[in-house]
């Protein structure tokens, strides 16, 4: 029998319904795995007592044949989802001891459907990073190793703790957030399915903000079916979020294994012109061939303004961050640095200097600069205009195709210290994920192959607004085509 912590969400639900094991046994298997691999630093807060209490309640519901859709399923939450009575830090010193008195809508949705929370996962500070190396709790180490080197690798970022937890069988599923690729890129690096729904599908209420016009909750799982199950539980209109979309939550599970007949797949050839590793290019070509053989029609498309995505993103996102993070002043909550006879301005300065890490300070400074009166027209407003052009490119493409397929990241996972001193190179890791974020489109990363060094590589599927169904359909087809490949880190 498969170890309980290695079961997918779907298989866990089936086993619990069949009474093959209890939720408490399932949770304990995950707790054992978490304790065994604490060196990966995936979790920053463990909630084992809560999980066991929730598991006992789940077992009672199964005994009474009244299970909810996620009854007894162990999950983890990125540490920017506010959890009532449980520390929520965004992995920043400025919030290191913050305990919210309310619950985020997304975690509440999962609790309402029977989910069991194992803990809060590590992340880049305020979700700013692509390698999970900016956390005040230290780096996250990927469960994966290259076959020619024993060096520690990054799990990607900013949702690296969630990716490491699911990839290392320390959670059945894990919540992440995706602003410019923070679910899709880590999923690519760790051999997982990472899904970011349409902007507004999941409530942002109770999520610590980075860039409000881009932030969206996402999910890590080990199968496409699991993604569909979790998304159905997470999504839905929320009056507490002004950006929430009033749209019915679709039935998504029927997308799995459905026919690719009459599906047109767009391939943006202009995005493969540079900065992409040969292994990634080969897997991209193999994936297109796989979809063609499955009955899809392949259509070459051009996204003319996507190449400006990174530049646009690193104007808009820091601008929004500088505004959002102005609330951390040491007055109302979070860290406060004090000394005798200090002025209010000195308290602000000392608190923010001590509370924010270097990457967050860098982005606040960039954001403040581009919003200044001298630069607003030249940078911020121009970036917003180009963002609209990027969105229009997608609208034009989707008049001809049903989905777009391209890599989730231009490289395989890299060593922990390899790129941290060059932020520009780190920013370019989101080259393929940022355009869809700027347009607010649903997208997923799906494991599509292994590099020559035995590391997972993910392909990204981008869909039309509110068309999570077709994204899952294409992802499921790719998943079926590579089922002979074992996306499992050695030793786990």
UniProtKB/Swiss-Prot annotation:
GO terms for biological process: translation. It comes from the Bacteria. Keywords: ATP-binding, Ligase, Nucleotide-binding, Protein biosynthesis. One of its GO terms (molecular function) is glutaminyl-tRNA synthase (glutamine-hydrolyzing) activity. SUPFAM superfamilies: Amidase signature (AS) enzymes. The active site is at residues 78, 158, 182. Its EC number is 6.3.5.7. It is an enzyme of class 6 (ligase). Disulfide bonds: none annotated. It catalyses: L-glutamyl-tRNA(Gln) + L-glutamine + ATP + H2O = L-glutaminyl-tRNA(Gln) + L-glutamate + ADP + phosphate + H(+). One of its GO terms (cellular component) is glutamyl-tRNA(Gln) amidotransferase complex. PANTHER family: GLUTAMYL-TRNA(GLN) AMIDOTRANSFERASE SUBUNIT A, TRANSAMIDASE. Belongs to the amidase family. GatA subfamily. HAMAP family: GatA. Allows the formation of correctly charged Gln-tRNA(Gln) through the transamidation of misacylated Glu-tRNA(Gln) in organisms which lack glutaminyl-tRNA synthetase. The reaction takes place in the presence of glutamine and ATP through an activated gamma-phospho-Glu-tRNA(Gln). Heterotrimer of A, B and C subunits. This is Glutamyl-tRNA(Gln) amidotransferase subunit A. It comes from Rickettsia akari (strain Hartford).
């Amino acid at each position: 029998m498969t170890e309980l912590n290695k079961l997918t969400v779907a298989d866990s639900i089936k086993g619990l319904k069949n009474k093959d094991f209890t939720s408490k046994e399932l949770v304990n298997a995950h707790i054992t795995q978490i304790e065994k691999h604490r060196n990966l630093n995936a979790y920053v807060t463990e909630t084992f007592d809560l999980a066991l209490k929730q598991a006992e309640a789940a077992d009672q519901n199964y005994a009474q044949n009244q299970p909810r859709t996620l009854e007894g399923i162990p999950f983890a939450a990125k540490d920017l989802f506010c959890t009532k009575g449980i520390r929520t830090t965004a992995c920043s010193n400025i919030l290191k001891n913050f305990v919210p008195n309310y619950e985020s809508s997304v975690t509440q949705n999962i609790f309402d459907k029977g989910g069991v929370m194992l803990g809060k996962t590590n992340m880049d500070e305020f979700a700013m990073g692509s390698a999970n190396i900016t956390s005040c709790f230290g780096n996250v180490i990927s469960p994966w190793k290259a076959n020619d080197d024993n060096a520690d690798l990054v799990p990607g970022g900013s949702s690296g703790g969630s990716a490491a937890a699911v990839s290392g069988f320390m959670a059945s599923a894990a919540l992440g957030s995706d602003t410019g690729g923070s679910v899709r890129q880590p999923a690519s690096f760790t051999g997982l399915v990472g899904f970011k729904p349409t902007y507004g599908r999941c409530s942002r209420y109770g999520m610590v903000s980075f860039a409000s016009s881009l932030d969206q909750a996402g999910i890590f799982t080990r199968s496409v079916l699991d993604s569909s199950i979790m998304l159905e539980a997470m999504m839905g209109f929320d009056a507490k979020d002004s950006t929430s979309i009033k749209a019915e939550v679709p039935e998504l599970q029927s997308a799995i294994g459905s026919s690719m007949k009459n599906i047109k797949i767009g391939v943006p050839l202009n995005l493969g012109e540079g900065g992409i590793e040969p292994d990634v290019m080969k897997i991209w070509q193999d994936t297109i061939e796989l979809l063609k053989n499955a009955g899809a029609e392949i259509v070459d498309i051009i996204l003319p303004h996507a190449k400006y995505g990174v530049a646009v993103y690193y104007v808009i996102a820091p601008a929004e961050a500088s505004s959002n993070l102005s609330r951390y002043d040491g007055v109302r909550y979070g860290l406060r640095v004090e000394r005798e006879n200090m002025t209010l301005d000195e308290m602000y300065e000392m608190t923010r200097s001590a509370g924010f890490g270097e990457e967050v300070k860098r982005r606040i400074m960039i954001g403040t600069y581009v919003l200044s009166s001298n630069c607003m027209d030249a940078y911020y407003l121009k970036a917003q205009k180009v963002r609209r052009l990027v969105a229009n490119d997608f609208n034009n493409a989707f008049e001809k195709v049903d989905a777009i397929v391209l890599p989730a990241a231009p490289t395989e996972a890299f060593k922990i210290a390899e790129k941290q001193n060059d932020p520009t190179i780190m920013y370019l890791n989101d080259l393929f994920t940022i355009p869809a974020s700027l347009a607010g489109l649903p997208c997923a990363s799906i494991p599509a192959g292994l590099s020559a060094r035995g590391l997972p590589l993910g392909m990204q599927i981008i869909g039309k607004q509110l068309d999570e169904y077709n994204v899952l359909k294409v992802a499921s087809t790719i998943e079926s085509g590579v089922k002979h490949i074992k996306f499992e880190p050695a030793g786990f």
